[in-house]
Amino acid sequence: MKALVLNALGRRFEFEDVEIASPEGREVLVDVQASGLCHTDLLFATHDIAPTPSVLGHEVAGIVAAIGHDVTQVRVGDHVVGSLAQACGGCARCLSGRPFQCQHPEATLRRPDDAPRLSRDGTGLFQGFGLGGFAERALIHENQLAVVPKAMPFAQAALLGCGVVTGAGAVLNTANV
């Protein structure tokens, strides 16, 4: 499949052929329909924040194409939007309604000794925020997805994952509006 890969800091993104694994456990394979370019993606591309090579893109929306055997929150055919919150769903903070303060966000990723979700020529690619939406498909933990109405346009849905929640969080939690 094609993905927009950042190979080194300060370089341009490049369209490349990459491999994507089959979904395991609580992973969901999403056919990406829209992905926004956020300023955070540009910061990742120009500052030493995340490893390269990487597939960024955290404002992502698409259609569920396949699910791992333990997935319970989405079904094939659902329209979904990705979330920045990498939350395990089982720690005290997640269970008290604070998934953004999850104590075990690594639970949404594959273990280092597992095969990578994304790879190129056998080498794993970093998946920005566990999403990697700058690709034709993305393999994402179910806790990082929210189902949206099928009538919602994908371009608008993609904005929900970062821009809208960031703005709403500032208005509701900081400005107390």
Describe the role of every protein-language-model region.
Residues C88-V177:
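NAD(P)H dinucleotide-binding glycine-rich loop of Rossmann-like/cofactor-binding domains
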Residues E19-I20, P51-G57, L125-G130, E136-R137:
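Short Gly/Pro-enriched turn/cap motifs at secondary-structure boundaries
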Residues V5, I20, F44, L139-I140, ...:
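Conserved hydrophobic "DFG−1" position in protein kinase catalytic cores
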Residues M1-K2:
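Extreme N-terminal starter segment of soluble prokaryotic enzymes
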Residues H39, H58, G169:
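Histidine-centered active-site/metal-ligand motif
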Residues R11-F15, H39-T40:
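Short N-terminal binding/cap micro-motifs at the start of the first secondary-structure element
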Residues A21-S35, A45-L95, F100, V147-A151:
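Glycine-rich beta-strand-centered segment in the early N-terminal region that forms part
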